[in-house]
Curated annotation (Swiss-Prot):
Keywords: Hydrolase, Serine esterase. This is Probable carboxylesterase 16. It catalyses: a carboxylic ester + H2O = an alcohol + a carboxylate + H(+). Carboxylesterase acting on esters with varying acyl chain length. Signal peptide: none annotated. The gene is CXE16. It comes from Arabidopsis thaliana (Mouse-ear cress). The lineage of its organism: Eukaryota, Viridiplantae, Streptophyta, Embryophyta, Tracheophyta.
Amino acid sequence: MPGVAVKLYSVFFKLLLKHRLQNLISISAADGLSDSFGVSTRSDESVAAANPSFTDGVATKDIHIDPMTSLTVRIFLPESALSPEPDSLRHKDNYNHQPRSDRRHSYGPNHNSPAPAERNESRRNSYGCNNENLEPYGGYAPSAKRNSRKLPVMLQFHGGGWVSGSSDSAANDFFCRRIAKVCDVIVLAVGYRLAPENRYPAAFEDGVKVLHWLGKQANLADCCKSLGNRRVNGVEVKKLNVQGQIVDAFGASMVEPWLAAHADPSRCVLLGVSCGGNIADYVARKAVEAGKLLEPVKVVAQVLMYPFFIGNNPTQSEIKLANSYFYDKPVSVLAWKLFLPEKEFDFDHPAANPLAHNRSGPPLKLMPPTLTVVAEHDWMRDRAIAYSEELRKVNVDSPVLEYKDAVHEFATLDMLLKTPQAQACAEDIAIWVKKYISLRGHEFSY
């Protein structure tokens, strides 16, 4: 069973969340909150500022990718991208090949495991490069003189019951830094529009938009490699050979330099947390439908962490664990009322139930490999497991990692982020994900 501290925190968490949801419902009913631009973060939530310098092995920056909406992306670039064979990567490989008896099992922490050794190796300075190569803004800037690696890209969709959470929240920043390091990937945390200002399908459309933006960035970067200084249609276009950017006569950058230098979009993974899992699964379906139209972007796998699934016919866990920790069923129902348009409210809505009879999109057999993470004390667990089972029936690699004595968001909630179980979950995800992002080749194809 979860500890006393978790139980107490859960009580206060649910009270505050229920109060917020009820306020949003009343305001939405009275005044209406529809706003096409939307909001991607709440003013009362703790956020972590982006830091383009390498701090604890990761540099971050925020990109506002759609001028018509509040859609943003926070990029998490691991320091391992600066060297073809970083020492930290070798250490990780050695760690991942330890005997299984020395690792936590997939159901939670192994309390007999020794604490990880402190890293004593020398590190680069806070910018990951020599001072003479720094850009004026003081953060990391790719350089043609420096060795670099192409890393897989992971699109991450945060949780928060559709109405809260953000790509730059303190908890999400910590989690994405951890994932970027253990998986050795560039993480793009998506700041999708929240409800009720923007109801379904806004958040889902934002996820697809980021995937297309990633493809556009890759194509622009390729174009930049062959483009010299020239005039196109009377407009001066310049090539910056150090950062791989294309700028117009006004100096506006069209290419994101970190992605141009380090991203390999042909090895793209989706990771969704709670309601973000619903978004990730939707984006995966759209990627399968698009097929080669998305090239060079290729979604090779997805990770669904305790997805926010529900349905009209309650499962055993939905009945037995309805009043479980943090996001219990009554509170989650309020969240769904704020997210789904009133005329579409139905627990068998395709956004809510992945196995609904009215599900659209490609057949399940075409879905990418899917890792599902569930918690023992989460009322949503059975439906997530059922979805995984249906994928396995059509020969999709779809394992389930179930963690004992765990609660919903046990690996991503602010209070629980530094627990051994949260660290173990990230490491288990990394082991599975690396099967599909290895440079030795991909096992999955549309």
